[in-house]
Amino acid sequence: MKKTVGPAVILVIILVMFYIVFNRTAPERKAVEVVFYNVENLFDTVEDTTVWDDEFLPDSAKDWTQERYQKKLTDLAKVLTEISEDDLPEIIGLCEVENRQVVEDLFATDSLGKKKYKVIHEQSPDFRGIDVALAYDSELMSELYHEAIRLSFSFDPETKTRDILYAKLLSCGDTLHVFVNHWPSRRGGQEQSEPKRLKAATVLRTKIDSILLKDQKAKVIAMGDFNDYPNNRSMTEIMNCEPGANQRLKNLTYDFHEAGLGTYNYRGEWGMLDQFIVSDGLLFSAAGCATTDSSVAIFKEDWMMYFPEEGSPSPSKTYGGPNYYGGYSDHLPIRLTLYCD
């Protein structure tokens, strides 16, 4: 008797063949780690008469010596080395750096020097002498363009603050639009200081909108210490990135805020000041670089923390006023994982 092959068997064979072909030809997606870290006053020990760096000199009340500076570099490098699950991070945004040289010194440390980072930095007019910076793995990506976006306030023209750093990077054949932020502080209270952050949000959102107008699927990452929480007006009304349908931007750290987690501990309460905001083009991309709304983490290890005899632990900071504690930073870093073809 002649045996026949039934439709069910044929279907199974076809599915198996598709599985084999797909798994042979589909490229493995590479994990690209993006990190943001407020490094708490990374100053060198050299006097710069163009900025106010008097606190961070060897003869200052803080006694900021070369030995302490080198320890700070080593400590920060340890954090940035440990934060990535596999290799060193591919993109690192920093704030509270004095100048380009301190950033170059950081990436010249033994552990970070293993990767060929290139630094993007522009000197800002900030009255404290602190800037933002970006470093990227030059063997994986390249810079197409960058600019420092200046912030000014018509209602307070004397205030000078740090720029927003924008970089256009080519990564794995895909274009990433990256913004590094350190918005004006909450000094003087939330109500008094909020207008400056609302202005910063307006400037950032306008720039992002100009990119999305040219390319609706543009892949945008805005990271930084925004000095606002995910539910503050700058985020919900101007950036318009709170959870919700049909929004072009999404704050990936909103759920941390809702859960009472954070990157900065103020008087025993955690606040999610450091955040990642991404465009829907990055969230819903089938090709190139993509991410998910669960691909963000706060990096928090016991060795980075200060454990008081009473009260809750907080990030182990370098200084408290003039008192030297020798810690890493008063902020915790955050990490975003991209998946690139």
Language-model regions: role of each:
Residues Q101-E104, R128-D131, R187-Q190, Y229-S234, ...:
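Extracytoplasmic/secreted cell-surface and envelope-processing proteins
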Residues V34-V39, W64, Y69-K72, L76-V103, ...:
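Active-site beta-strand/loop signature of hydrolases that rely on acidic residues for catalysis
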Residues K2-D110, K114, I120-I130, E309-S312, ...:
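N-terminal, active-site-proximal structural segment of metallo-dependent hydrolase catalytic domains
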